[in-house]
Amino acid sequence: MINAKGRYLFSSESVTEGHPDKVADQISDGILDAILAQDPDAHVACETLVTTGLAFIAGEITTKAYADFPSIVRETVKEIGYNSSTMGFDWETCAVISSVDKQSVDIAQGVSRTKPEDQGAGDQGMMFGFACDETETLMPAPIYWAHKLSRRLTEVRKSGVLDFLRPDGKTQVAVEYVDGKPVRIDNVVVASQHAENISHADLCDAVKKEVIFHTLPESLVDKNTKIYINTTGRFVIGGPMGDCGLTGRKIIQDTYGGMGNHGGGAFSGKDPSKVDRSGAYMARYVAKNMVASGACKRCEVQIAYCIGVAEPLSVLVTSMGSSDIPDEALTKAVREVFDLRPYYISKRLDLKRPIYKPTSCYGHFGREQAGFTWEVTDAAADLRTALKI
């Protein structure tokens, strides 16, 4: 799609940490982190459902650690900002129910091995990684700016700059491309939960000033950029009271905003033995290093696994037409530079740590901060050597 010629629009959306699906993701990853902090080899598959006044935890967890589910839920909800029963979700009074079993022994025997390096994949499936040179973090422009807007919505709410905002919110950005290159932002959509006493006009003016124009660069916004804010006119009922939230329902905004492909697997609540997560992180690491190496301007990586088998069944690297180097040569270089077996992915990216809760909001990729080891471009030189460029 991004190779299209001519002029076209591409849109991506993001949601804030108060969106019900993201509340669920944060709880699942909060539980995962609490367990990994005590037991790095734990096997965790933790799912969360949130609705009015209730959080339900389910899944399969095999560990020597203890995690206080109610405390983790309440602390997470408190951090997000649901602190009143009038919002339909209050960290002090919400009910917490759990039903958790151990991981199936049939799955465990495919993952656990006498030699750690022979660790099999925790499931079958294919994972995709993507990178492009549209932004400084090598992420597509639409999702990059959508996440920026969502983070700003939360920032002005928590800092009190716009104290009438509430935790739930969504953003969407449509970028205009010419021959595959982003040239301007055509339209912006913001939906933000708010207090009942703010008028629609005042809310729109404040969000334009403090969120949209504060965040988006003048070079991409012009007089023809269209802005849509709370277009139903009212967004008082939100969060888990407005919609039931579930872990793993925001997989596109978690990744590349629809730019490139997606294997279908969610991330939150899963330990790194689950290749849905670790394989996708590795695919991003490979793709980003390939673009950083200068070998191509865009790169997509697909890795496929079989449960209980260490070696990937297939690996494909494509420049999507952005390089003179054949895809076959790019793929060969990746196989030379990277060991894509699950044990070595976890070891190289140091994934058996409590690093996951920060990933659960505003995208798992394009975040160049401590803990996001898959965003480091330390393999670019090795790829240049392998490709002889």
UniProtKB/Swiss-Prot annotation:
Region entry Flexible loop, spans: 103-113
Listed transmembrane segments: none
InterPro entries in UniProt: ADOMET_SYNTHASE_CS, S-AdoMet_synt_C, S-AdoMet_synt_central, S-AdoMet_synt_N, S-AdoMet_synthetase, S-AdoMet_synthetase_sfam
Gene Ontology biological-process entries: one-carbon metabolic process; S-adenosylmethionine biosynthetic process
SUPFAM superfamilies, per database record: S-adenosylmethionine synthetase
GO molecular function: ATP binding; magnesium ion binding; methionine adenosyltransferase activity
Cofactor: Mg(2+); K(+)
Pathway where this protein functions: Amino-acid biosynthesis; S-adenosyl-L-methionine biosynthesis; S-adenosyl-L-methionine from L-methionine: step 1/1
Keyword entries, A-Z: ATP-binding, Cytoplasm, Magnesium, Metal-binding, Nucleotide-binding, One-carbon metabolism, Potassium, Transferase
Annotated residues for binding of K(+): E47
Protein EC: 2.5.1.6
UniProt feature coiled coil, ranges: none
Amino-acid positions noted as binding ATP in the UniProt annotation, renumbered to this chain: H19, D168, G169, K170, R234, F235, D243, R249, K250, A266, K270
Catalysed reactions, as listed in the record: L-methionine + ATP + H2O = S-adenosyl-L-methionine + phosphate + diphosphate
Subcellular localization: Cytoplasm
Domain of life: Bacteria
Entry-linked Pfam families: S-AdoMet_synt_C (PF02773), S-AdoMet_synt_M (PF02772), S-AdoMet_synt_N (PF00438)
Known partners and oligomeric status: Homotetramer; dimer of dimers.
Family, as annotated: Belongs to the AdoMet synthase family.
Protein name: S-adenosylmethionine synthase
